[in-house]
From Swiss-Prot:
Gene symbol of the encoding locus: yejL
Species: Salmonella newport (strain SL254)
InterPro entries, per database record: UPF0352, YejL_sf
Record's protein name: UPF0352 protein YejL
HAMAP family, per the entry: UPF0352
Pfam families, per the entry: DUF1414
Domain of life where this protein originates: Bacteria
Family as reported in the entry's similarity comment: Belongs to the UPF0352 family.
């Protein structure tokens, strides 16, 4: 999801690496990983975003996710 951010690439990459390590440690298959990450996003929105802004934040997140998905056949 490339865009300007107030967070450094290094900080983002460190968090991503640690989250991936946890999923790998638990040998989580793709479907379980997506379910857990989706639940995490839902929890963050519901607990950290004002109720009036939740739907807009969720829609923005969904659009950013869809725009970052690659159409190639590699996996």
């Amino acid at each position: 999801m490339p865009q300007l951010s107030r967070y450094s690439d290094e900080h983002v990459e460190q968090l991503l690496s640690e989250l991936l390590s946890v999923l790998e440690k638990h040998k989580a298959p793709t479907d379980l990983s997506l379910m857990v990450l989706g639940n995490m996003v839902t929890n963050l929105i519901n607990t950290s975003v004002a109720p009036a802004q939740r739907r807009a934040i969720a829609n923005s997140f969904a659009r950013a996710l869809q725009s970052s998905i690659s159409e190639d056949n590699a996996h």
